[in-house]
């Protein structure tokens, strides 16, 4: 589902990150992934897809970045999945700096303060593929280095995508 940008004052990466963390903290179960609950917790208007089973919102942050917040059914299951992501819409090599004011460490600290337990899921060469956070709902958090400008920026983990079930 592609969501048309909302016509309002653009949110910053930090603004939308704080709203998503507030939303995650409010979820008691997968049943809370409803239009009404997301609108109440994020302050954003959701749009329903033509099929009626999916909904979401999204908007530009700047000329290179946008965010998407989408909910849809999990195939073969009676539950929904929320996907939040920062999407490069301009320069495909743009640094994540505009969407990394709250970095992975900030997200992880906030999620742990909410009672979530974390574990890294590793891929080949012991590289972290994503982070699992278990609580009232299950999260997968995918990260990316802030930029290729320096070893420090490469190692600085920014949140790229979060899925919630």
Give short role names for the model-derived ranges:
Residues 36, 41, 45-47, 70-72, ...:
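A structural detector for beta-sheet-dominated domains
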Residues 52-61, 84, 128-133:
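Generic recognition of long tandem-repeat/solenoid scaffolds
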Residues 126-165:
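Glycine-rich, aromatic-bearing surface loops/beta-hairpins
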């Amino acid at each position: 589902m592609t969501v048309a940008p909302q016509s309002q004052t653009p949110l910053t990466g930090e603004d939308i990150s704080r709203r998503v963390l507030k939303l995650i903290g409010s979820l008691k179960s997968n049943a809370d992934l409803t239009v009404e609950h997301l609108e109440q917790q994020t302050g954003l208007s959701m749009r329903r897809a033509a099929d009626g089973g999916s909904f979401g919102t999204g908007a530009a942050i700047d000329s290179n970045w946008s965010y998407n917040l989408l909910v849809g059914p999990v195939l073969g299951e009676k539950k929904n999945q929320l996907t939040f992501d920062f999407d490069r819409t301009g320069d495909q090599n743009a640094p994540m700096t505009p969407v990394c004011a709250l970095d992975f460490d900030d997200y992880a600290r906030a999620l742990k303060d909410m009672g979530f337990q974390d574990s890294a899921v590793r891929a080949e060469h012991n590289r972290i593929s994503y982070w699992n956070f278990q609580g009232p709902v299950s999260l997968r958090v995918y990260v990316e280095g802030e930029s290729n400008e320096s070893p420090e920026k490469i190692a600085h983990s920014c949140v790229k995508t979060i899925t919630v079930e």
